[in-house]
Design a protein with these regions (language model features):
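Acidic, proline/glycine-enriched N-terminal capping motif
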Residues: 1-54
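Acidic, low-complexity central loop/insert segments
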Residues: 2-5, 10-13, 56-144
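Short, conserved charged micro-motifs
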Residues: 18-23, 73-77, 118-124, 200-204, ...
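Short, intrinsically disordered, mixed-charge
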Residues: 24-33, 78-86, 183, 208-211
Length: 266
């Protein structure tokens, strides 16, 4: 039986003719050719390129909906509100929750539907994932990042979100750092999924011999008594098939299914 992701996410509403241009300068995706009604994933960064939120944007004739897939929606709403000026021709609208569904295939598009809507025909016979199942899939996919990955110290390239980053659309919040990282290949660590039959905790260091190679971020205990999680692994150890925890625990590394490689330097 096929399964699908069905969850409600917070929406930040922006009203006004300037919503598209405003988001063009505040988020990482190039919206110049985005068709109204089509979902566009993007990121919201700090001025120094740290990831604050993963977004799904939908433009319309009256403004834009900003769905926060990962991150603090309240902090983002406050942050956007603080940088809106009269010349932007945009204003904050009402907040709401939006139901979002997506089949569990790497190339499957997402859809926004009403709370009481019948599932589209392509979901016939599909089962909604339970919360634990959904978390396991998130860890194996590497998307969306969770609170343990959104610490304020990571950038989108480290978390496999290169597809959300435009390097040629012009100036936006965090753009200078993204360009520098892409130009010199300066990604020091990358996200990896891991599995282990031994107990680990979030924040535990991972080692290659005596050398620190990474750190555990997310963790989930499965019914089989094994564990699956995410970790940030230093660049020089990305080809390692296994590392050890702080007490010698064996940890097997896997590339997350949806991880997108960071751009290579010219």
């Amino acid at each position: 039986m096929s399964m699908h992701w069905d969850e409600a996410f917070p929406i930040i509403r922006l009203n006004g003719a300037g919503a598209k241009d405003f988001l063009q300068g505040q988020t990482t995706a190039d919206l110049r050719k985005t068709v109204h009604g089509r979902l566009q994933q993007s990121c919201w960064l700090t001025a120094t390129g740290r990831l604050r939120a993963v977004l799904e944007l939908r433009l319309d004739d009256d403004g834009a909906d900003v769905l926060v897939l990962a991150g603090d929606a309240d902090a983002m709403a406050q942050g956007l509100d603080q940088v809106i000026f009269p010349a932007d021709r945009v204003r904050m609208g009402e907040r709401r929750l939006q139901r979002r569904i997506q089949a569990l295939r790497p190339d499957s598009p997402a859809a926004w539907i009403d709370d009481e809507s019948i599932l589209p025909s392509e979901f016939a016979g599909s089962r909604r994932l339970l919360s634990t199942e959904l978390e396991e899939r998130r860890l194996r996919l590497g998307f969306p990042p969770g609170p343990a990955e959104l610490t304020g110290n990571t950038n989108p390239f480290e978390l496999g979100l290169a597809q959300c980053i435009s390097l040629d659309k012009g100036c936006y919040l965090g753009q200078e750092t993204m360009a520098k990282l892409a130009g010199r290949g300066g990604i020091k660590q990358q996200l990896r999924c891991w599995v282990s039959s031994n107990r680990l905790n979030s924040g535990d260091p991972l080692f290659d011999g005596e050398t620190r190679a990474g750190v555990v971020t997310s963790i989930l205990e499965l019914e089989s008594d094994s564990l699956v999680g995410l970790a940030l692994i230093r660049r020089q150890y990305l080809t390692s098939g296994a590392l050890n925890g702080p007490n010698g625990q064996m940890v097997t590394l896997e590339r997350p299914e949806l991880f997108q490689d960071p751009p290579s330097p010219d």
